[in-house]
């Protein structure tokens, strides 16, 4: 952080530190060390925070983007697209106002809740860069399988739908900072969704599709009228990255 910032925005720095402490406590994480750097005047325009996390590998977990299997259910841990939509509105480039808040949240409690009910989980991914749609295409390619989604089952907040409708954006490709994409056998899906819905920030968890042997490497969408269409794969970022 710049030396000027330490004086001019001391209150902001204290606010950030308090938020870090609150979130770490919520996630059960200890902040055990810290350091600061001083940069010359004009070299930075805000606060830069870099973290290194150290944890333990779960003994009962065996997940990978290469382990999705035909017959698996595709699950999301909550409604999608909130974070990307929130950042878009915060930039105030389109003059749109909507009551949308980011889904940013720690996810360890949600992961633990799933493994408390079953170890039979094949894939877990966060849906940050590129959103849920990009993650699904990556998993389909890594596992050599197809994925069929049901448009009616994908949870999207009405406010996010409205903003996306006005700007021609697809919620599936908006970043999520507090959502998981999970692949697990269909007979485990109900237990996983039930466990997630008891967790903070996962009240809208839902099964949104299934893994298929056909259409390998592709994601197909079953529309509200029952037809099927290939989900387009964007060639780049829909919105400028901020992280």
Question: Would you name each region that the model predicts?
Answer:
Residues 3-4, 8-243:
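Helix-biased detector of long, well-ordered alpha-helical tracts
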């Amino acid at each position: 952080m710049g030396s000027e910032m330490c004086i001019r925005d001391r209150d902001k720095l204290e606010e950030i530190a308090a938020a870090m402490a609150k979130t770490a406590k919520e996630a059960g994480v200890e902040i055990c060390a810290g350091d600061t750097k001083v940069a010359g005047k004009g070299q930075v325009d805000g606060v830069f925070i870099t973290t290194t996390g150290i944890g333990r590998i779960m003994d009962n977990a065996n997940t990978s983007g290469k382990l999705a299997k035909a017959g698996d259910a595709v699950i999301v841990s909550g409604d999608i697209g909130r974070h990307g939509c929130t950042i878009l509105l915060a930039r105030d480039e389109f003059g749109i106002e909507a009551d949308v808040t980011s889904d940013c949240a720690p996810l360890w409690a949600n992961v633990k809740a799933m493994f408390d009910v079953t170890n039979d989980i094949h894939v877990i991914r966060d849906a940050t860069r590129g959103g849920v749609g990009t993650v699904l295409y990556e998993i389909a390619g890594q596992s050599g399988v197809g994925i069929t989604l049901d448009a009616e089952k994908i949870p999207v907040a009405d406010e996010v739908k409205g903003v996306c409708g006005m700007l021609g954006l697809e919620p599936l490709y908006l970043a999520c900072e507090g959502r998981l994409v999970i692949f697990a056998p269909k007979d485990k899906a109900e237990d996983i969704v039930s466990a997630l819905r008891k967790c903070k920030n996962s009240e809208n968890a839902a099964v949104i599709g299934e893994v298929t042997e056909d259409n390998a490497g592709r994601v197909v969408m079953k529309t509200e009228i029952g037809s099927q269409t290939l989900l387009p794969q964007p060639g780049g970022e829909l919105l400028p990255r901020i992280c």
